[in-house]
UniProtKB/Swiss-Prot annotation:
Entries under InterPro entries matching the protein: Ribosomal_uS19, Ribosomal_uS19_bac-type, Ribosomal_uS19_CS, Ribosomal_uS19_SF
Keyword Magnesium: no
GO MF annotation terms: rRNA binding; structural constituent of ribosome
Biological process, per Gene Ontology: ribosomal small subunit assembly; translation
Name recorded for this polypeptide: Small ribosomal subunit protein uS19
A GO term from the CC aspect: cytoplasm
Gene3D superfamilies assigned: 30s Ribosomal Protein S19, Chain A
NCBIfam families: rpsS_bact
Described purpose of this protein according to its UniProt entry: Protein S19 forms a complex with S13 that binds strongly to the 16S ribosomal RNA.
Keyword entries, A-Z: Ribonucleoprotein, Ribosomal protein, RNA-binding, rRNA-binding
Source species of the chain: Acidiphilium cryptum (strain JF-5)
Gene name as annotated: rpsS
Length: 92
């Protein structure tokens, strides 16, 4: 079920403050965030966020196509190493 339209997008408050401070400084440094649940807003376009995936911060450069999505969509938490090989087929 999607979020109600009347509620609006969810963004943690500290992220707005960090984004405004980064824009004011003019330096394009990585903004570390832990909030994977926050929605990407149009004012974040052009900024680089370090999204925490449980182990490390993955850099995410925000583009216009990402607006409306969540930060967690661009920082995978699991690594897929492939399925186990069939041992009987290898012995031949």
């Amino acid at each position: 079920m999607t979020r109600s339209v009347w509620k609006g997008p969810f963004v943690d408050g500290y992220m707005l403050n960090k984004a405004d401070a980064s824009r004011a400084s003019g330096r394009n440094e990585i903004i570390k965030i832990w909030s994977r649940r926050s929605t990407i807003l149009p004012q974040f376009v052009g900024l680089t966020f370090g999204v925490y995936n449980g182990r490390k911060f993955l850099p995410v450069q925000v583009t216009e196509n990402m607006v409306g999505h969540k930060f967690g969509e661009f920082s995978p938490t699991r690594t897929f190493n492939g399925h186990a090989a069939d041992k009987k087929a290898k012995r031949g």
